[in-house]
Amino acid sequence: GSRVLVGRDTFLAENGIDIVYLCPVTWADDDPREEFWSDRQKKSGLKNPQNPYRVKDYYRIDPEYGTDEDLLLFVKEAHALGMRVILDLVYYHCGPAAVFIKDHPDFVKRDENGQVKNGRWHFPEINFESAELREYLWKNMEYFIEKFDVDGYRCDVSPSVPLDFWEEGRKRMEALKPDVMMLAE
């Protein structure tokens, strides 16, 4: 996480690294129910519900990775050394205890009985038919550029997210940072 990397970016730069890609740093869901665990989590035998690709809060840094200040410092240090920093965006699915599910039940897909629909990794699937959800996620992209000065994003499971969502997101990111990077998985 960002706390571990602070002060190590000199080593990265000295070894020719000019882009640092951080896996999800947002607050991971630790819901213990195994029906929401990925196949890899189940097979590992570790009985650990935490998975950084099962997001609980898109606007909070997971304490396991540090604080907002840690990420700010890391990005600032990386930029001073000529490196760019990109974050992983996990928008195909979220965690079962995602903070928005209770207040915005339409942010996730539901079956005919109104139950949350899980995607292929057993995590609740995001509902891109919701205009409010799209705005929430575009604002999330803007948030990390504006607050932390990140240089772009790696878009997890990008083919499963509507292309027009990514296109609009790219336009909005370029308005903030013209040389923004977006990498599709």
Locate the predicted segments by residue.
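Acidic-and-aromatic substrate-binding clefts and catalytic sites of carbohydrate-active enzymes
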Residues: 64-65, 159-164
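Short catalytic-loop micro-motif centered on adjacent basic/acidic residues
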Residues: 86, 152-158, 183
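Substrate-binding/active-site clefts of carbohydrate-active enzymes
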Residues: 2-4, 11, 15-18, 24-148, ...
